[in-house]
Amino acid sequence: MTRPTLEVPVDSLDSAVLAAPFATRLELCDDLPSEGWTPKTSLIERVRAAVDTHLVAMIRPRFADSPLTLTLESFIANKRVMDASTQEIKSAAAAGANSVAIGLLQADGHVDMNACGELAELARSLKLEVAFLRTFDLLADRARGMRDISALGMKRVVTAGVLGWDAAISTLEQRIAVLLSDAMNAAGAASAKALASGKLNASTTIKSAHANAPEQPHIPLARHAVEIVPGGGVRASNAARFMSVSSHLHASCRRDGVFNLDEMRRLHAVMNSAQ
């Protein structure tokens, strides 16, 4: 299995400092209870001064009239959103972030390739990795979405393996099945890119990197597939099941709206035991 990684979303310096010893990455955002917005530059600077952990800045501009609903319409690009996102990416880089997470969509339910491509190009010019937000779960076609974010060169994507934002609408087993399909789509998309660029022999095949996942003998080897990062209700109690799909997890470890250090420790222990 690939070395496990844990991404923890935080919206304060205190929670960042508590999570840092256990996290591979900290996703910095503002107002986590509303699923997060672009963090203030001052938060990135203070966390950067306090910890050495890889920092991801969520890029989700907030305006006085921003809708709080977590629907497709809330993530559609326009000039105001693009102007703000551009400045926020520049500010995040200057403040010490290592990555940004973006996820702008079109009204037809597909990835906004132009908007995301422009922001990703800017981020990479500033030496930032680029990831895709959980807006992936709002897409009309997950297979096409995976091809799209692969074409955009996304490093990883956070997804609950559901359609929509409410992870509770599906059983754990249903989510695992969707995530497995996402992982195979990611491998297929990466392989297609490699074949197109002449970097992969069409006869090369792969096996799943995870012992509990089904073998897929006809999928070409994909060394640079988008990393599937299960998120949405990930806990120590179910982490092992999610890790049957991916060794990368996204968990806030919050109880009653507050970061819970005991849950963080339990989750970290489960992930370490899976190595």
Residue ranges and their predicted role:
Residues 32-51, 106-124, 139-144, 163-183, ...:
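Active-site-adjacent beta->alpha loops and helix N-cap segments on the catalytic face
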Residues 14-18, 65-91, 137-151, 219-220, ...:
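Catalytic cores of alpha/beta
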Residues 10-31, 95-96:
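Catalytic domains of carbohydrate-active enzymes, especially glycoside hydrolases
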Residues 22-27, 51-54, 96-99, 125-127, ...:
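Glycine-enriched alpha-helix->loop->beta-strand junction motifs that scaffold or abut catalytic
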Residues 4-8, 26-28, 55-59, 100-102, ...:
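Hydrophobic faces of well-ordered beta-strands that scaffold small-molecule active sites
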Residues 27-34, 95-107, 154-166, 245-264:
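Glycine-rich phosphate-binding active-site loops on the catalytic face of alpha/beta enzymes
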Residues 42-113:
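Glycine/small-residue-rich loop that forms an oxyanion/phosphate-binding "nest" at active or ligand-binding sites
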Residues 62-63, 67, 180-275:
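C-terminal alpha-helical cap/extension of soluble enzyme domains
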